[in-house]
Structures are given as C-alpha cells and as structure tokens.
Amino acid sequence: MWRLALGGVFLAAAQACVFCRLPAHDLSGRLARLCSQMEARQKECGASPDFSAFALDEVSMNKVTEKTHRVLRVMEIKEAVSSLPSYWSWLRKTKLPEYTREALCPPACRGSTTLYNCSTCKGTEVSCWPRKRCFPGSQDLWEAKILLLSIFGAFLLLGVLSLLVESHHLQAKSGL
C-alpha cells in the first residue's frame, strides 16, 4: 500500500528541477527504486523536495542534476537513504539560491536569460537582476563617479587653501 503512495510522491517529485535534465541518469526512477528497496526507510523517501520557488538556467540545472546523480550513486552503493532529507534541505537552502543568483547576475547574465521553473521544467525568458540586488554592498558607476569627483574636489580645495596660506605667510615674511 505504501509503495503505491510512494509512487505518487515520485511522480510529483519528477517535476522538480533536479529531474528536468539529463534523462540518461533517470534520477526519479533510481530514487524510486532505491526507496522501494529500503522499505524500513520510508520516512526519508516520503519527503518530496519542494523546489517551486526556484528557477535555474540550463548550466545550473545540469550542475544540480549531476550533483544529485552523484549523491544517489553513493546512496545506492551504501544502500542507505537516511541522508536524503538533509541533501534536499541543503539543496533548497544553499545551492539553489546560489545557482539562481549566479544565473541572474553578471557576468553570467547580460540583459536577459532563459530560466527553467523548478516545478514545471518550462523555460521562460527573464530580465537579469539589477546590479544593486546582485551586489548589495557595491556601488554602481554613477555613485563611483560622484565619490571620485567629491574626493578630487576636496583635495583641490585643500590645495587652494594651502596655497593661499603659504602665499600669505611668504608675503608677511617679505614685508618684515
């Protein structure tokens, strides 16, 4: 009975972006087989990954698929799925946001890029993120120009003031 329910979970999980690319790896099928072999570990397999909040470019999707392939290969060799929930969590909290940022920020993104929705595997053309969102602590070119001009102006003013003080000092000295 639980195998039937487990099959439904894998059909839903098959739409996650981890399973969108590189069909030769057959990740969803391998994951289903691995979990069906480990009947006692039903709890670890039952947790379906939720990647609906993410969209990745093709290169990032291939990286995630390759990484998942390697993780599943280790689990198949060890015949253990206990680390599967922590892998899904790490992927969702660490790698997918990192890959999304890489795909939408310079230098990888120039103007627009095609991202694939992680819940539907459908590609959509999207605009790149603004530089301030990609690099929140950095300044854009206009702000850098203003900063440089301000510093230049301050040094110029200090130079003129220094010249005036020195000139008055020399006039006072020659007048004595």
From Swiss-Prot:
Pfam families: TMEM95. It is a single-pass type I membrane protein. It is found in: Cytoplasmic vesicle, Secretory vesicle, Acrosome membrane. N-glycosylated. Residues 1-16 form the signal peptide. The chain crosses the membrane at residues 146-166. Disulfide bonds join C17-C118, C20-C121, C105-C128, C109-C134. Its main location: membrane. Keywords: Cytoplasmic vesicle, Disulfide bond, Fertilization, Membrane, Signal, Transmembrane, Transmembrane helix. Residues 17-145 are extracellular. One of its GO terms (cellular component) is acrosomal membrane. Spermatozoa (at protein level). Residues 167-176 are cytoplasmic. Sperm protein required for fusion of sperm with the egg membrane during fertilization. Belongs to the TMEM95 family. Does not interact with sperm-egg fusion proteins IZUMO1 or IZUMO1R/JUNO. This is Sperm-egg fusion protein TMEM95. It comes from Homo sapiens (Human). The lineage of its organism: Eukaryota, Metazoa, Chordata, Craniata, Vertebrata.
